[in-house]
């Protein structure tokens, strides 16, 4: 696991970073699919991870969901108990508020991608918009726009913004479904179909006994 240190890693996102990149996020997904799909089933396509594909949408979505799966929607108290002995400042109320707002504000960066690549807005203008509407410091806004203008990664942000709500709706609090994300060859359409079926069942009138 490599951590980008161009900007300081904030304590507010430390637990999410660990869960996303290691366990139960990217690392177990790659290892379980390597063993279950590539070695056992010989589905060689699973040995290749292509950027900007539906595979990435699910990979980033499940990784972003990882902390929530193991600690629930409000993990701050547990995280604080681990960080306090290390002398890392971690205000649970602030982190909870930032987490809620931060997820919603993720759409600001996705809109910034459209501003850059569809509207033709210049980087300086979009950096200012990301700082203002995304509630980011100028340095972090500039880093976000740098990511959005990179030839390889400029569309990748969609994997985070759209992947998390899709995977969360699919898992719906069921660890067995999260295990499916880690282990099976799924597509966004498969998840959408399951979500639609779940909603249809919940909306169906109860049958008389």
Range-by-range predicted roles:
Residues 8, 44-50, 93-94, 108-109:
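Flexible glycine/proline-enriched surface loops and loop-helix/loop-strand junctions
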Residues 9-10, 24-25, 31-36, 188-189:
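Flexible loop/turn segments at secondary-structure boundaries
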Residues 17, 21-27, 31, 61:
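Catalytic glutamate of the conserved HExxH
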Residues 30-32, 36-37, 42-82:
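Post-HExxH zinc-binding segment in Zn-dependent metallohydrolases
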Residues 48-60, 101-102, 151-160:
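Active-site metal-coordination segments of metallo-dependent hydrolases
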Residues 60, 67-147:
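Long, amphipathic alpha-helical stalk/connector segments used for oligomerization, subunit docking
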Residues 131-209:
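C-terminal, non-catalytic "cap/extension" segments appended to globular domains
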